[in-house]
């Protein structure tokens, strides 16, 4: 989830021998309330440029790459439960959004699959980033024994229990 300009998807497709990678992103500016614009706010024109960049960057992979321009929740309806081997979450980073994505995509993964994401240790002001808190809470509620975090504190993952 959250393909932005397609860099991570390109890397995955280049070095991973999987059958198909689906990038999901609404490529749409999100609304915010309050007096301060969040530091991660991106205007719609930039989202449109990211979408075109993703299409161009991933075209070389043909049928192995598929983009869905929609929200995570709406796109998830296209996937059956226990049908995915891997899901990577790097969308909105506030607690509620991360928890929602975890709840949406966890059932879509097969037992033994990997649920992963980005920006574990990132915090740079409003809105409060809640990646770590959401992943820890979700893991506790779903009997996930081990959360693995890279040494740079950016990427996290866990295996779906059998």
Feature-to-residue mapping (PLM):
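S-adenosylmethionine/decaboxylated-SAM
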Residues: 1-162
């Amino acid at each position: 989830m959250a393909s932005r300009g397609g860099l991570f998807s390109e890397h995955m497709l280049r070095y991973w021998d999987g059958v198909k990678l689906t990038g999901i992103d609404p490529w749409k500016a999100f609304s915010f309330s309050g007096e301060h614009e969040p530091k991660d706010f991106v205007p719609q024109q930039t989202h449109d440029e990211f979408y075109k960049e993703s299409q161009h960057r991933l075209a070389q992979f043909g049928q192995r790459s598929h983009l869905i321009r929609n929200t995570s929740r709406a796109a998830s309806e296209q996937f059956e439960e226990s049908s995915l081997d891997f899901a990577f979450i790097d969308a909105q980073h506030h607690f509620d959004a991360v928890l929602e994505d975890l709840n949406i995509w966890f059932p879509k993964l097969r037992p033994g699959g990997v649920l992963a994401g980005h920006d574990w240790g990132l915090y740079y002001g409003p809105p409060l980033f809640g990646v770590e808190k959401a992943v820890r809470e979700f893991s506790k509620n779903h009997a996930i024994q081990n959360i693995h975090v890279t040494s740079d504190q950016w990427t996290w993952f866990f295996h779906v229990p059998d």
